[in-house]
Amino acid sequence: MISIVFVLHFCEICKKGVTHMQLLENRIIKDGQILGGDILKVDSFLNHNIDIPFVNKLAEELHRLYSDCGVTKVLTIEASGIAIASLTALSFGVPMLFAKKSKSSNITGDVFCSTAHSYTHGCDNNIIVSKKFLGKDDKILIIDDFLAKGSALSALLDIAKQAGAEVVGAGIVIEKEYQGGGNLLREKGLRIESLAKIKSMSAEGGIEFCR
């Protein structure tokens, strides 16, 4: 486990005009950890021990980016996307719906189903959403904490398509741009707004953000 060296002074974060993207990049540098390979661990503030005031600012920025799209529901996948998706849904004043990775006893009736590959865990997950919560009148904003190769996002798009719902776009906290999933989906016409985009990452060289 290798901690990323914090190279930015706190006073820089406080300067007037610092954007949400810059605040997030600074936080990643300060508190993120690069694990072997392509894993960026940000569980100290984003997806395990959640810094609610900070993540809420990210959610407000995602709301600003999509405020004119008529969003009726926010869609994510369990579990690490739930926090940012919930706060984004709160900003919109709409429900948040998350796809489950297994059918539990409290889900009854018909479901939409797709498959998402987890590169972190090296396995395929069948994800499901109850049909009673997603329909053709919905305008969906997909929210997730990470975008890498695009498997989870593609699975959520598939579920929305099965439901006949309109996807207005996707809001991502951290995109690993170098893994190509985001650009591939953009080429297919999906609007994706990422608050931080990583150009390259390694334990030796640290993180380089896209500019």
Predicted regions and their residues:
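PRPP-associated nucleotide enzymes
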Residues: 1-143, 147-211
